[in-house]
Amino acid sequence: MTEATQAQPAVPRLTSLSHGGGCGCKIAPGVLSELLKRATPPALFPDLLVGTETSDDAAVYRLNDEQAIVATTDFFMPIVDDPFDFGRIAATNALSDVYAMGGKPILALALVGMPINVLPHETIAAVLRGGESVCADAGIPVAGGHSIDSVEPIYGLAAIGVVHPSRVKRNAAARAGDVLVLGKPLGVGVLSAALKKNQLDADGYAQMVATTTKLNRPGAELAALPGVHALTDVTGFGLLGHTLELARGAQLTARVHYASLPWLAGVETFVADGVFTGASGRNWAAYGTDIRLADGLPPVAQALLTDPQTSGGLLVACVPEAVDDVLACFRADGFDRAAVIGEMADGPARVDVA
């Protein structure tokens, strides 16, 4: 064979180079909680409005009476094999934490770890372009970053945003009687597991990418609505984990209505066939003692409710009178599956699902 006709080495699948993918590769919540016990007490910094104390989505630091900085970082290993899509998903997921605090992103820095001698440079460049495309859609620059030669592919962003100090929305401020509204359908982790097992068809892949690359832009507008008390996004700890954070922060019981939950197409069938992530079980092991699942729920309920979401939806706690405005805010930005999924009530800090 001539040099021109020699077979070129196959480019490995991105997902084959990592032991986990997306937010499913987070450190288990119980382990993370133990590690963070040694964090510096936030009381030493009076302008630090939000730190690590309630496992909120981002740090918030007050600059003056009119402006605060929202700072967050998020990165993970590939959840898909297409490098451009991987970059888009990772960037969308990172920016979500700014929106979840009620903030508006202004700047991002890229965080890149790649097996530089394994992946073609054009593959790595496509990941970066994917992230830049999302940031351009959000109206912000990728102004720099940091890179290392890594055994497993890693990509994400450090994101900076701004918010008025009075409009910061924490995950610990829900009140009894608040209604819970979820912005995106659930099941991303299940679809990613199906993809890794070569069981996800083109339509399933398309819906997974569509939901994970949709910016949670309504966050800032939601934060400005009267009657919106708390805001977070549903990511690696699953719907139950992030709802439990709301419950613990407010010392209330969160009630979730299973029949009202929006699901991505096909996820219930996949779980029934045994296709779901290992992170689902780790999530349940970490917080299952504070969950009450009613009798009569489908056998797949536990795995679905703990399914790790990558770039998941915003979860809003608001007064009943604000629900129509919250849903209108979501739908004006194309979140057609936004739904009322439960409410907060007096009671022990736990989640009840019925």
Swiss-Prot record:
One of its GO terms (biological process) is selenocysteine biosynthetic process. This is Selenide, water dikinase. Its cofactor is Mg(2+). It catalyses: hydrogenselenide + ATP + H2O = selenophosphate + AMP + phosphate + 2 H(+). The active site is at residue 23. It is an enzyme of class 2 (transferase). Mg(2+) binds at residues 57, 97, 233. Synthesizes selenophosphate from selenide and ATP. The record marks 26 as: Important for catalytic activity. The keyword Magnesium applies. Keywords: ATP-binding, Kinase, Magnesium, Metal-binding, Nucleotide-binding, Selenium, Transferase. The gene is selD. Belongs to the selenophosphate synthase 1 family. Class I subfamily. InterPro entries: PurM-like_C_dom, PurM-like_C_sf, PurM-like_N, PurM-like_N_sf, SelD_I, SPS/SelD. GO terms for molecular function: ATP binding; magnesium ion binding; selenide, water dikinase activity.
